[in-house]
């Protein structure tokens, strides 16, 4: 079997495991790159942008539970089964910013969506917020699931600190990722409690390992991702979202933020959310970086109420 077939086999096992069967299609961006999207459910569209070095299937448990919503799970360029970024990897922060500024609108054009709600997490939040600021009329609402790149950090996972060392990124993408290494990386970035509780279970770990082993997701995304921290100056302040940019996001924004997110927890959330014109913050106790894995019921209920109105049947 080819690498793509081996990856698809693991992905299909995961979807069966969560009891869902998404449809799949590819759309073409203006630069000619093909982007894979999976769709699940009926209702108003909800475009979901995943975090770093992962793909759209990372939303599987949330999407399977969001009744009344048409979830559109996107593999960002270079991730999952989407084409790499044309002329990538992106080697400097200005190039990353240009890519983030243009991707969301380009994607919505390809999806033929004039306006939609957007959900995001981590690196996906950087794309969601910067892209929305570029064309706010295209986004009706945003749900941000915990900390996003562009927000301040009050702590930095060990993997991020190591990645900031010169030459480390190139080394990381050359090393084979064992199942154990995948688990440890996920734990570092804030999925430890979900793994310990079994909400990120063996089928999900097998899928994540297959993604690292049988696709170029890790290489493509690591080499095109900005440094959240720098070896000398600490947090990369040039990456932070400015008040001027955030002021352009006048649509309702819901933050479902893990209180114990190792990238930036409750204190960061309470300082960051009020910087947006119309933001609601829900801090989820004992949740980490992927709050829908730690407390699915709360994330589903709050998301449906926010997208469908207070009368949503929860």
Indicate where each model-derived feature is located.
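Catalytic active-site module of serine/aspartate enzymes centered on a nucleophile-bearing elbow/loop
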Residues: 278-314
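Flexible "cap/lid" loop of the alpha/beta hydrolase fold
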Residues: 142-175
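Short beta-strand/loop motif that positions the catalytic acidic residue
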Residues: 249, 255-257
């Amino acid at each position: 079997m080819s690498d793509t077939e081996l990856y698809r086999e693991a992905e299909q096992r995961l979807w069966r495991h969560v009891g869902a069967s998404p449809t799949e299609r590819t759309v073409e961006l203006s630069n000619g790159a093909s982007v894979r999207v999976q769709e699940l459910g009926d209702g108003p569209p909800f475009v979901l942008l995943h975090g770093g070095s992962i793909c759209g299937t990372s939303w599987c448990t949330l999407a399977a539970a969001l009744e009344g919503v048409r979830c559109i799970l996107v593999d960002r360029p270079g991730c999952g089964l989407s084409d790499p970024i044309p002329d990538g990897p992106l080697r400097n922060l200005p190039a990353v910013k240009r890519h983030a500024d243009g991707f969301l609108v380009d994607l919505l054009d390809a999806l033929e969506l004039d306006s939609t709600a957007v959900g995001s997490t981590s690196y996906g939040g950087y794309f969601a917020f910067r892209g929305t600021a570029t064309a706010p009329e295209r986004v009706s609402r945003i749900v941000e699931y915990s900390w996003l790149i562009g927000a301040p950090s009050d702590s930095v996972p060990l993997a991020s600190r190591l990645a900031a060392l010169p030459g480390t990124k190139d080394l990381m993408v050359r090393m084979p990722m064992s199942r154990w290494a995948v688990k440890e990386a996920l734990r570092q970035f804030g999925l430890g409690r979900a793994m310990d509780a079994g909400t990120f279970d063996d089928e999900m770990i097998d899928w994540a390992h297959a993604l690292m082993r049988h696709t170029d997701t890790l290489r493509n995304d690591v080499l095109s991702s900005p440094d959240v921290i720098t070896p000398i100056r600490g947090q990369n302040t040039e990456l932070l979202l400015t008040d001027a940019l955030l002021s352009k996001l006048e649509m309702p924004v819901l933050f479902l933020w893990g209180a114990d997110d190792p990238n930036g927890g409750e204190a960061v959330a309470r300082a960051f959310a009020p910087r947006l014109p119309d933001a609601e913050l829900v801090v989820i106790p004992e949740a980490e970086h992927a709050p829908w894995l730690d407390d699915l019921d709360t994330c589903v209920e709050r998301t449906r109420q926010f997208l469908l109105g207070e009368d949503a049947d929860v």
